[in-house]
Amino acid sequence: MDFNVKDFGALGDGASDDTAAIQAAIDAAHAAGGGTVYLPAGEYRVSGGEEPSDGALTIKSNVYIVGAGMGETVIKMVDGWTQNVTGMVRSAYGEETSNFGMSDLTLDGNRDNLSAKVDGWFNGYIPGQDGADRDVTLERVEIREMSGYGFDPHEQTINLTIRDSVAHDNGLDGFVADYQVGGVFENNVSYNNDRHGFNIVTSTNDFVLSNNVAYGNGGAGLVVQRGSYDLPHPYDILIDGGAYYDNALEGVQLKMTHDVTLQNAEIYGNGLYGVRVYGAQDVQLLDNQIHDNSQNGAYAEVLLQSYDDTAGVSGNFYVTTGTWLEGNVISGSANSTFGIQERADGTDYSSLYANTIDGVQNGTVRLYGANSTVSEQPSSGQQATLEGTAGNDVLSGTGAHELILGLAGNDRLDGGAGDDTLDGGAGRDTLTGGAGADTFRFSAREDSHRTDSASFTDLITDFDASQDRIDLSALGFTGLGNGYDGTLAVTTGSGGTRTYLKSYEVDAQGRRFEIALDGNFVGQFNDGNLLFDAAPVTGTEGNDNLSGTDAGETLLGYGGNDTLNGGAGNDILVGGAGRDTLTGGAGADVFRFEALSDSQRNYTAGDNQGDYIIDFAVGEDRIDVSALGYTGLGNGRNGTLAVVLNSAGDRTYVKSYDTDANGYNFELSLAGNYQGLLGAEQFVFATPPEQATIEGTDGNDSLQGTGADELLLGLGGRDSLNGGAGDDVLDGGAERDTLTGGTGADTFLFSARTDSYRTDSASFTDLITDFDPAQDRIDLSGLGFSGFGNGYDGTLLLQVNAAGTRTYLKSLEADADGQRFEIALDGDFSGQLDSGNVIFEAGVFNAKDFGALGDGASDDRPAIQAAIDAAYAAGGGTVYLPAGEYRVSPTGDPGDGCLMLKDGVYLVGAGMGETVIKLIDGSDQKITGMVRSAYGEETSNFGMSDLTLDGNRDNTSGKVDGWFNGYIPGQDGADRNVTLERVEIREMSGYGFDPHEQTINLTIRDSVAHDNGLDGFVADYLVDSVFENNVAYNNDRHGFNVVTSTYDFTLSNNVAYGNGGAGLVIQRGAEDLAQPTDILIDGGAYYDNALEGVLLKMTNNITLQNAEIYGNGYSGVRLYGTEDVQILNNQIHDNAQNVAYAEVLLQSFNDVGVSGNFYATTGTWIEGNVISGSANSTYGIEERNDGTDYSSLYANTIDGVQTGAVRLNGAHSIVSDQPGTGQQATLEGTTGNDTLGGSDAHETLLGLDGDDRLDGGAGNDILDGGVGRDTLTGGAGADTFRFSAREDSYRTASTSFTDLITDFDPAQDRIDLSALGFTGLGDGYDGTLLVTTGSGGSRTYLKSLEADAEGRRFEIALDGDFVGLLDASNLIFERPAIEGDAGDNALLGTSVAETLLGHAGNDTLDGAGGDDILVGGAGSDSLTGGAGADVFRFDALSDSQRNYDTGDNQGDRITDFAVGEDKLDVSALGFTGLGDGYNGTLVLVLNSAGDRTYVKSYENGADGYRFEFSLDGNYQGLLGNEDFIFATPSGQQLLEGTAGNDSLQGTAADEVIHGGSGRDTLAGGAGADVFRFSELTDSYRTDSASYADLITDFDASEDRIDLSGLGFSGLGNGYGGTLALQVNSAGTRTYLKSYEANAAGERFELSLDGDLSGLDESHLVFDERVVLAGGDGNDTLSGGSAAEELLGGAGNDSLSGGAGNDILDGGAGRDTLSGGSGSDIFRFGDALDSFRNYNSGANVTDSIADFTHGADLIDLSALGYTGLGDGYNGTLAIVLNDAGTKTYLKDRGGDAEGNRFEIALEGNHADQLDASDFIFATAAAATGIEVVGSTPAEEQPVV
């Protein structure tokens, strides 16, 4: 319908004020349900409203303003207007407006003739509130001469389009997009505006700017930027085509935004940059023409720059990363510095491909980011960099060439196809290059290292020496060697299956670089695959321009005036001769000078050949002058360099004043002021001339060392020696000397005992002031001491003084002169001195020399121990036991064992069986190790070989272990470097070999353990250790037992047979300790053991390969609560000898009772195994249905099993006859923002929470983004995009969490919506999805228009236009059905949600993964849901029935019901709940064995059958109604009467019966019924008549009477708000009555049949008010007939009390309150619950729809108001609007922010309201009431 404004009085004469007339036309169109308001050609003058937010004209829903054309119809502000106008035409503030707009006219702000700020167009909802304007269209609109903004759609608008419009000569921006969602600016022009042409701000997203033009603006042509620091940045914005030129600042500026694409635009002639990316992420600049910018100064055409807001409002630093520039044609102006430039401010990860750049002045490209790249070739895909987090990441590349950065954490990186660069970063990483020529880059030595106690070594799994490379160029190693002096050693593990590249030199933290490679690469490393130093970039003798890359390189300029730029990486720049300009770029660079002529100056001749360093970074870069002989900074003389600042303060010179024969002196300069910043640490100086020996005299000398390695000899006298830097040797000589080593590894040498001694009367003890036990040594090798001891017998006693400030090494044996050797050390070194830092003499100690006999009878323990102690005292050695049997006894304490080995001592015999150490007969003590290391001491470099330990178990009674070593469990320390070879341990009652807790680098090889009472071999917390070529047999428990945090452990070619437990077990040691991890089991055999061949229990990252496992009692291999286990290329056969088991069993472990955890077995990889079953073997490979999942089975050969080759229950487990294409079949994200990339295999990618990016790569993949706003790319192959919950992808009125599918192929890809309940395509309502596109047709949306309780509407987006292409072939709405027939069927589901229909027959249904529905149908069926939330549905009684008379049992059996997840659907059968099995209920019955629960009815059908099914397990006390889907009980739940005299009869169900007014007869029937009375007039009497209701069957045992809405307080005498209980004389009727009447003479009375004199307050509900509470959103709460309390909470709520005396409290937000019938209270608990701010325009005033004077109350007691008045001093004013339709209660004072309390009452209450209608803070009544006919003028808000 059209509404011509001239019909409403508008003149359009350019003089008259037409505001009212045009607004009247708008209002009329709105009242008619919508229409077009037409303005014929003319000039229509308009004025503003009372407030800025009123604008001039307010447009409303479904109304469009249309003119005769731009310039023909003009709406113009009146002259002289002085008040701000936030939108000449606008939508109403605080109201959601939709389907409106404007076209074919001009808005003129008349800025020259008024003084106020006036904006042109404005629309939008309240910032931060839940709401939005929608579907707004502006076409062919001109906005000009505004003093403010032109087009200003503002905050929370969805689907706005502005096209073919113009903004010019406005005071601020031409076009603004402020929080626009799904909008379009198309074919618009913005010119000559004072600020920006286009300004996109404040969370705007999913927004398109197409073919717009901006020129001649005072700011930038187009800006996309953050609006406020606490709001999300704009994102997902496409700028396509158009032109941005001749603007004063940038053509396009992208500032603090992300995911923006700028393409196909022309950008030229702008004052600053053509394009500036400023603190933005993931921006694409594609195929643009950018030229002739930088008109106002020297700038790059394209600048990439980070934004430092740390001192600003947010406190954040916004790094520009992930910028992609491709296919742009860039040409510079005379001022343009670079074509593309990164600032050196953290900007990084820029990717430049195939850009054409010319005409720039300084260089085409300048990149500083260490990970930024440039190529002249087109890219192979956008994702050039995959970056992890600080956590443990799994990153997988695609078929492209990628850079994969793990960063911190223990990461798994897989390059996939392509020539990739993998950089694990910090943490213990696993690196797999995949196909292609890959580079494994190490950027810092600490990225891959080990210490003495832990390994953080990276593992390369698939190094190809013929094409892959290891880049070590950033680490400073010089090549391969012995691991010292900057070289790397190449070693292999004992089995030759792993190669190590390692340095033996530690840093200050004890870290030594090491990497590991799977496989043997000895002899295969060369310059082609190990990059120690990047190939040099060399110049010529001419003037060269050399540029590095992002690697560490050496740039050699040679002769000429060269320009060298290192780029990223740690570079070395050598300018050579000539005057060179040196720029290091990013990284730690070295500027090296190899000759004086490299940088020199002749002040006499005026010849300046000094080099110039542009960007020297203090603390990172260095200047190397070591080749020139300069030794330090100084005055520039005598081999020193002076630092001199020029007079301008902008250049620093480093120079020598010493000239050569030609008059030249060395000099270089640095750009900038480095005074006070340069120190010796910024230089590499020459080592001062070496002084090999600094010798003193016989006097008291003070000797000072230098930075070299020196020998300081004090000779006689009391000397003071200080070694300085370097590894020095200090020998004080005679007398009392003070020795200070200084930095470096120093040796304190004592050449004679008399060099340092004391007597009884005097001390001549030398003092060492700074001994470092980690690197320094004390050399006593020439003094004859044998080691540590008690100070006697050639030993030294270690003693610390009482204060703990000084340590002494002393002999207590004096020489002939009474002198006892002694030295002192400053500090407490107890426990820190050992053979590693105190040098004694070592040798071989024969036990027989110490009294051992070896005769098989004598106790040789003391003699052997004496030999051990002597070897230790001598600094280490070998204790040799010749052939014989050496009996030993225990020492008494179990922890002392029999023999105690010590540092540096090895126990060696004549051979196994030749030398036997045997426990004496009759020993009854517990012995924790016949041979062991000391408890609580760190012992290193010790072991045992070529002998037998015999525990003599038949002739002893204590628990005896053979070998034991280790440190205190849980403490910081470890035994180290332990070796046992050719040792037999037998006949122990306990363990054989038991290396225990915290041992590093232990090797046991070629040894045997047999006939022991527990395990043969134990590995308990071993690190970097090996068991090799050992045999364990006939032990009572396990052959090998690996426990307690053991990691980096190898078991190679071991054999275990005939043991009473398993052959090999790897398992957790205790619930509070880390699990064993990173263990390789390679080769060997495990057979004929009583339990499993190999058991892996509560462990992770284990590989079992190349072994033969057979003849064992249980499974060959059992995985029990493990993660990431590989079982590869084994022979597993003929196991399950003792019981029916699978050959390979995968099972989860329920440890809730101990640790509280459930350990699911996941990530198992089984490939290439040959498996053959025995007569008992059930399956070749079986998963238990207990949460075990993500198993991947490839190319295994299985035969001879009895039940089936494979049984998998995991929803994500897979099996294939083909070899696997990679280990990772499932990629799973975290709760953060993840980037997951698939490979060429078929994979499932699970994003989980967070805003994830999933890329399937090749293969037929399943992508499930999970919660968050995800970007899904299927890649090659037929991919499925799965949505598991509606909240995985949705939008609300104000925010979008919509997932985006970037590459949907309707011919092969599918979208799986089967779990969401949608029925198909449609209009978006009634369970259908609507297909729409964005305005440009470049994006398709699948959306529901129906919101859930939280306001969420399901929606997904697809890049591209798929209208007409989406159908049943690519959209999965319904779960697929798997159907049987009338026979006995076995139906197996898959990992998706399905319906399994068995139909008739005795069927077996297994849902496997997914949320399945299982319907067995007729017959006795077995139902297994599998993983997921499954529903077991029964459609007929005959689906599961039993006849107890005939014995026919057709009951179904459910094997795996999961309480809290699965459901039992009996709704079709009419059962209404759990009960006694009668009257439509079901009863739960447990069988006598307690292992099966029956769900049954006791009511037989006509054929004698009753419904019954069973569940495996005991569910008594676990199953409740919530686990069932029951039928709705028959009959109404609420029986509601009318106003007449009703007769209401209940049923057997529980009902609420409300007769309402009238004299009603009420009967509840069976069940627990409630008789409700909401108002006094529901049941009452007067003096002359009775209208009392009668309850005929009140059951005091279960019924109740609800009086909560009437205000009675309890039973009493009928007065004071109580009710009297009275029985008539015949005892046939009981009355509840009040004797207090209301004004109409009505008093409550109720009759009940029978004598109910026993009624008490337990049968009556007096004040049990139900609370209905909303949330923080916009809630609608509706009460019933009872008295309720309705709490809205935050948000704009709608509260309706219904019947009853209700309390309504809207809370914060603009609420609508309706009490309904009854006496209601409208309560306000905070002044901001209902307020208005006339300054800001905020209107949050609550409205009461049905206030009733004399019945309802308004409760203001919490706010402090004392009465009615003028609105000041604690009173409220009553104000009536002009129309007399609304009454306001107002506080005219307000708070400090200008917020004024205000309530609106619908209707005219001005003459009725008085103090009796309120609950004030005090009882003060108002003395006067001010009634104002119209609203007074308020202060005007500033918008």
Curated annotation (Swiss-Prot):
InterPro entries: Beta_helix, Carb-bd_sugar_hydrolysis-dom, Hemolysin-typ_Ca-bd_CS, Hemolysn_Ca-bd, PbH1, Pectin_lyas_fold, Pectin_lyase_fold/virulence, Peptidase_M10B_C. Its cofactor is Ca(2+). It catalyses: [(1->4)-beta-D-mannuronosyl](n) = [alginate](n). PbH1 repeats lie at residues 133-155, 157-179, 180-202, 204-226, 257-279, 280-302, 320-342, 347-369, 975-997, 999-1021, 1022-1044, 1046-1068, 1099-1121, 1122-1143, 1161-1183, 1188-1210. The keyword Protein transport does not apply. Inhibited by zinc. Pathway: Glycan biosynthesis; alginate biosynthesis. Composed of two catalytically active A modules and four R modules. The N-terminal A domain introduces a mixture of MG-blocks and G-blocks, whereas the C-terminal A domain only generates MG-blocks. Converts beta-D-mannuronic acid (M) to alpha-L-guluronic acid (G), producing a polymer with gel-forming capacity, required for the formation of the cyst coat. This is Mannuronan C5-epimerase AlgE3. It comes from Azotobacter vinelandii. The gene is algE3.
